[in-house]
Amino acid sequence: GRLFKITACVPSQTRIRTQRELQNTYFTKLVPYENWFREQQRIQKMGGKIVKVELATGKQGINTGLA
């Protein structure tokens, strides 16, 4: 199947001294095509947004049968 490589940004609250500051956390993950919409909704529910979406080439899967 196809894989998307997504970069998303979600707000994470960190305590800095006494004040609370909103800080964005960026993460990258590979998402199978079938799970794409679910992942998108999950990120949006967290108040985040998807910054970048790339089509990941399927080259990682070549050695799967050798494990």
Curated annotation (Swiss-Prot):
It comes from the Bacteria. Signal peptide: none annotated. GO terms for biological process: photosynthesis. SMART domains: CpcD. InterPro entries: Allophyco_linker (IPR011134), Allophyco_linker_chain (IPR011064), CpcD-like_dom (IPR008213). Pfam families: CpcD. Its main location: membrane. It is found in: Cellular thylakoid membrane. It is a peripheral membrane protein. Coiled coil: none annotated. Residues 1-56 form the CpcD-like domain. GO terms for cellular component: phycobilisome; plasma membrane-derived thylakoid membrane. Keywords: Antenna complex, Membrane, Photosynthesis, Phycobilisome, Thylakoid. Belongs to the phycobilisome linker protein family. Rod linker protein, associated with allophycocyanin. Linker polypeptides determine the state of aggregation and the location of the disk-shaped phycobiliprotein units within the phycobilisome and modulate their spectroscopic properties in order to mediate a directed and optimal energy transfer. This is Phycobilisome 7.8 kDa linker polypeptide, allophycocyanin-associated, core. It comes from Mastigocladus laminosus (Fischerella sp.). The gene is apcC.
